[in-house]
């Protein structure tokens, strides 16, 4: 059974607006590695459309090598999209239908290691359903003072156990957690 890995960039004050953090070469390399290792990506409509607009090929040759690596990884990946408003998707994507929990369980039942989950609203719903197996928060040494926060509206606390950490020259730190019940 595949794990569901949720990873998100977050500022010190909890903002997850991608424009509030500095996407350094080392962070793009880390993200590319995570994406390339995933069996598939799982997005809600907003994140899917944002990522497609930013990373669908063709890519600019002016991008740094690490950014090109990230762009290639996300462009080539198989994707699942949870949406009640889209009628169809492309870009190596399948539109999920029916009950969210059932659809995600079917994805997790597939072969492989893990499925990457991105975004803000969809991961909150998945956390509420107890479907996320691992969380990675890439915490940036920045205070945004505004913006969306992860897990707004979560119906219960998440009790997590730290399983790993990695720090970069920029001062950003990736911290990985699993739900305490599965630690």
Regions found by a protein language model. Give the residues of each.
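Enzymes that bind and transform nitrogen-containing heteroaromatic metabolites
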Residues: 1-183
């Amino acid at each position: 059974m595949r794990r569901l890995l949720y990873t998100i960039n977050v500022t010190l004050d909890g903002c997850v607006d991608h424009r509030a953090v500095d996407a350094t070469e080392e962070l793009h390399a880390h993200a590319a590695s995570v994406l390339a290792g995933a069996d598939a990506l799982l997005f809600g409509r907003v994140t899917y459309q944002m990522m497609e607009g930013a990373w669908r090929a063709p890519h600019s040759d002016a991008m740094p090598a690490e950014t090109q690596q990230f762009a290639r990884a996300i462009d080539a990946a198989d994707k699942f999209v949870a949406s009640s408003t889209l009628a169809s998707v492309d870009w190596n994507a399948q539109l999920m239908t029916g009950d969210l929990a059932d659809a995600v369980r079917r994805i997790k039942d597939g072969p492989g290691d893990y499925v990457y989950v991105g975004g803000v609203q969809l991961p909150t719903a998945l956390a509420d359903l107890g479907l996320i197996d691992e969380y990675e928060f890439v915490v940036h040494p920045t205070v945004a003072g505004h913006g969306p926060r992860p897990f707004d509206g979560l119906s219960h606390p998440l009790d997590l156990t730290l399983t790993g950490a990695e720090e970069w020259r920029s001062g950003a730190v990736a911290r990985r957690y699993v739900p305490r019940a599965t630690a």
